[in-house]
From Swiss-Prot:
SUPFAM superfamilies registered for this protein in UniProt: DsbB-like
Topology relative to the membrane: Multi-pass membrane protein
A GO biological process held by the record: protein folding
Main location (coarse class): membrane
Keyword annotations: Cell inner membrane, Cell membrane, Chaperone, Disulfide bond, Electron transport, Membrane, Oxidoreductase, Redox-active center, Transmembrane, Transmembrane helix, Transport
Protein name: Disulfide bond formation protein B
Gene Ontology cellular-component terms listed: plasma membrane
Role according to the record: Required for disulfide bond formation in some periplasmic proteins. Acts by oxidizing the DsbA protein.
Family: Belongs to the DsbB family.
Encoding gene (name): dsbB
Amino acid sequence: MTAFTRFAHSRASWLILTGSAIALEAAALYFQYVMKLDPCVMCIYQRLAVFGILAAGLIGMTAPKYRIVRILGALGWAVSATWGLKLALALVDMQNNPSPFSTCSFLPEFPAWMPLHEWFPSVMLPTGMCTDVPWQFMGVTMAEWMVVAFSGYLVALLLFIVPILSGSNKPSLYK
């Protein structure tokens, strides 16, 4: 077993994934509450995608020696990062090509059985407009930085997918 595979089978790798998602969520709340930047609906959906990555990291951390746990974590990681990238690209398009016919809604469209914007309004209630660009760093908007972040998550997943799916030296169907 290579060092890379051992790392993919360790809690440390999943802890790094979880920690990076926590850092992004903390940054989002810093922008919202300290810098007073209002999140739009697409921003809220991207927050949810980051929470999905956080959940995937927690799943992987529970028992990373077992292949089934790593596969479930990787599946959550892939779905959340792909969905987040799709949302970030759509937001970049809205900001770069504003149109009165293509706008985002004022309220998120969560399922009726899970109205996150009502349960957690301080984190999941949008208050901004999607076409606003209130912040840039090095000439790159927040939406464009999220494209970088979600792309980074997908590149990391591509690097880790083979070691994640590989078994250990122990003879077992699940390891």
